[in-house]
Amino acid sequence: MENEAITAYRQRRAAFEATFERHLAAGVVFYSADGILIDDTVEIAPGAVILPGTILRRETKIGAGSVIGPNSLLENVTVGENVKFNASQGYDSVIESGAAIGPFAHIRPDSRVCENVHIGDFVEIKNSTVGKGTSVSHLTYVGDSDVGKYCNFGCGVVTVNYDGAAKHRNTIGDYAFIGCNTNLVAPVSVGDGAYTAAGSTITDDVPAGALGIARARQVNKPQWAKGKLEKFIAKQQAKEEAGSK
């Protein structure tokens, strides 16, 4: 008598193969079935490309011309047309047409990534709207925020949305430029066309068209490192001499 686990696996496999064949016959492009799992409830438009290692769950919908994968997970996400979703995960969200996601991005629930947005590597979006044409290219957390269109986020931006008791929202206007390593301590707003200087921790609103700077002024101390450098060089020379003996 066959093991129950084996029977269950074969049933799941048969169901997947039927789903796979249905999408293939409808014009969805698969180069290989390796590592692909697709729930029967998923909708995929003809012309979409599903690459190996892709898992599509629940009520996910994929638009025509979109390329999903490799190694991606989408659960209850609506994806528009001509989206690129590479080596990333998304849950309970909307990704509009022309967006490019990944690699290694995380789209958490209740997010909307609008048309032609770029979400790059090691970016996390949570309960936020990212406006049309905005670029969030790398190493950034956007949580509980409303971001306008055609904004640019530098590397290392963090929306500081949790005070230990409650979550708060940030608002970033259209055409804003958020400098590298900016912390936006919610609730704050950055106005249309405003800039934040790299390395700033923004705790007050930045008006439209303004530059927000919130960082200590640099101080150089001449010759401060000279003694340390001399000791380090002497230590390295001693090691080299000992090793040559």
Give the predicted meaning of each segment.
Residues 1-47, 207-245:
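Terminal amphipathic alpha-helical/low-complexity segments used for targeting or macromolecular assembly
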Residues 2-4, 17, 21, 43, ...:
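Glutamate identity and glutamate-enriched acidic tracts
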Residues 4-8, 58, 182, 186-188:
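Catalytic cores of large soluble enzymes that bind and process phosphate-bearing ligands
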Residues 22, 36, 40-42, 60, ...:
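Residue "hotspots" at secondary-structure boundaries inside conserved domains
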Residues 85-245:
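Glycine-rich hexapeptide-repeat left-handed beta-helix
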Residues 13-19, 32-34, 49, 64-70, ...:
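Short, functional N-terminal and low-complexity linear motifs
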